[in-house]
Amino acid sequence: FLPMTQTIKRLLNEEYLGNPYHLNFRYNANYGRSPEYSWRFDQKRAGSGSLGDIGSHFIYLSVWFFGAVTHVSAELCTFIERPDLDPTGQPYVRADDFSIILLTFSNGAKGVVQATTVAHEPTPWGQTHYFDLHGSGGTLRGWTDWEQTYKLLGAKAEEKQFQEIEIPELIQEGQQLGDIQQMYKETFRKRGQMTGEFIEAVASGKTCSPTFEDGAEIQRILDAALLSSQEGRKVEINKIN
């Protein structure tokens, strides 16, 4: 997990928000703006487009922050006209390049996750991320453009303005947030917090997070979102096998 999301999780564990009300996460990317064929938007090859490719990350964070999801409503859209045939000359089903998902959590809180691959994001990585979390005790707000901004703000219910929240050195582990792209590379490539951590857990017989069970639960939410969009209705997670 990146330093910002680790810090948000710590603050939630310390009940910074009090009773959680709702969250709004936006994942803006631009890699889907090109009209050429791409396997990422081929339903058979990718499984889903923006929903599974990038929306899944923020859906997982939503569950990590606010707990289990009970119901899902979603709308998946395709804005970019792409070729009717894949490179082999076969027709294919075009996957979504934009998705918006409404989550209902078991504690009564709500969440909105928006994932788009067709946003114009004039930054080196072509992405921006936004996090808003609200509760009885206050608000947390974070965002990054993966170039110059990597910021987390907070305001308790009795405060009149936001304060920048420092990301502790314990979480940074020596990473320099001033160089945001280097921080990302160190987190996921040098420190082994993705594949390396998983391999170490298998070799040592220990448990790592996220688990396969976590992944299966997120897949159920994705399946519920696809069904909701197809049938135009709210879907209960327990009805998804």
Where are these regions (language model features)?
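Glycine-rich beta-alpha junction loops
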Residues: 1, 26-31, 76-81, 107-109, ...
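Predominantly a Rossmann-like dinucleotide-binding segment in NAD(P)-dependent oxidoreductases
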Residues: 1-93, 232
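A general structural signal for well-ordered alpha-helical segments in protein cores
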Residues: 4-5, 58-59, 191, 195-196, ...
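Beta-strand scaffold of nucleotide-dependent catalytic cores
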Residues: 20-23, 112-115, 143
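Glycine-rich phosphate/pyrophosphate-binding beta-alpha loops
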Residues: 56, 115-123
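C-terminal glycine/acidic-rich active-site capping loop/insertion
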Residues: 84-86, 92, 100, 104-105, ...
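C-terminal hydrophobic helical "lid"/dimerization subdomain
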Residues: 215-229
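Terminal low-complexity tails and localization/encapsulation signals of metabolic enzymes
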Residues: 233-241
